[in-house]
């Protein structure tokens, strides 16, 4: 029922957008480069997966240990606003982990369904190239938390004498995380250290995707598991485009993975049929489960 509600909301949004013709139809290119061996640090991916899994858990007491990381602060509760955990990690620095869709929250569901494109928020539009467009729902979800995230990150960077900031997200939280990672790179002293994004949906148009490549391409880590369908939405036909490079775990929930270079690589995830369930979206990412509300609480890094 919850999944059906999401699908109906999504298709209703597409119909409304199509009728009003308020989205961009520009379509970016597709990479034809062959995949290469996974160059990413899989231990860091495993840790990042645990840190974002914990955002789905109700245990939010400061001092909680997940992997090498200590939970410092939590904002949002997953209903009116997505939950965001702030950690300190010897591996990742100050780590910002953002929860994905809470299917028990209509507000959270609606963020996924608002497919139309809009300009970047007035707070950061000056940093983006002309013509940049972002999905309304994902940007709205991030803007609800933007000021609190910046305040907390600045506070804990100072308290922990830490220069590194890593942003992590899953699903809706991955889209929010990409926008947050760009915002930190563009507007915060010291910029971004890394970002790890799991099951990332498309966030913006080709202008945005290419600007991500330009600004944080060497810090950007997108991980897709198996036949996960979430990274295939919103559709490219609506003017959306992924930034370059993703690691594809295939078969799903295994440790077999390759990097697919460039934007929208033709040899990757679209070569296999999608499965419209959450078995791979909420799966095992290099020995750590991201199971959302049905996952392990507290999160267990490297337990699989």
UniProtKB/Swiss-Prot annotation:
Protein name: Secreted mono- and diacylglycerol lipase LIP1
Glycosylation positions in this chain: 32, 253
CDD domains in alphabetical order: Lipase_3
Similarity remark: Belongs to the AB hydrolase superfamily. Lipase family. Class 3 subfamily.
Native source organism of the sequence: Malassezia globosa (strain ATCC MYA-4612 / CBS 7966) (Dandruff-associated fungus)
Main localisation: secreted
Phenotype upon changing residue 277 to F: Shows a clear preference for short- and medium-chain p-NP esters (C4 to C8). Decreases considerably specific activity
GO cellular component: extracellular region
Gene3D superfamilies: alpha/beta hydrolase
Assigned EC number: 3.1.1.-
Keyword Signal set for record: yes
């Amino acid at each position: 029922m919850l999944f059906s509600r999401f699908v109906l909301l999504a298709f209703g949004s597409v119909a409304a957008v199509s009728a009003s013709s308020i989205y961009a139809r520009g379509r970016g290119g597709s990479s034809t480069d062959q995949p290469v061996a996974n160059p990413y640090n899989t231990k860091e991916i495993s840790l990042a997966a645990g840190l974002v899994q914990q955002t789905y858990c109700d245990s939010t007491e400061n001092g909680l240990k997940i992997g090498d990381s200590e939970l410092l602060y939590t904002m949002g509760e997953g209903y009116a606003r997505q939950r965001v955990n702030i950690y300190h990690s010897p591996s990742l620095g100050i780590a910002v982990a953002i929860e994905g869709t809470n299917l028990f929250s209509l507000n959270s569901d609606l963020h996924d369904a608002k497919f139309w494109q809009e300009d970047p928020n007035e707070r950061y539009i000056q940093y983006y190239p002309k013509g940049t467009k972002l999905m309304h729902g994902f940007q709205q979800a991030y803007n609800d938390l933007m000021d609190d995230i910046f305040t907390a990150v600045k506070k804990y960077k100072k308290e922990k004498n830490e220069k590194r900031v890593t942003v992590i997200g899953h699903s809706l939280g991955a889209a929010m995380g990409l926008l947050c990672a760009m915002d930190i790179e563009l507007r915060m002293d010291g910029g971004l250290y890394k970002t790890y994004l799991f099951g990332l949906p498309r966030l913006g148009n080709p202008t945005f995707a290419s600007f991500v490549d330009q600004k944080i391409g060497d810090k950007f880590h997108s991980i897709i598991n198996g036949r996960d369908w979430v990274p295939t939405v919103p559709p490219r036909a609506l003017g959306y485009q992924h930034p370059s490079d993703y690691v594809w775990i295939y078969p799903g929930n295994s440790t077999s993975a390759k990097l697919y270079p460039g934007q929208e690589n033709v040899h990757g995830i679209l070569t296999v049929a999608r499965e419209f369930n959450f078995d791979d979206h909420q799966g095992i990412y290099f020995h750590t489960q991201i199971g959302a509300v049905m996952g392990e609480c507290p999160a267990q890094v490297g337990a699989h």
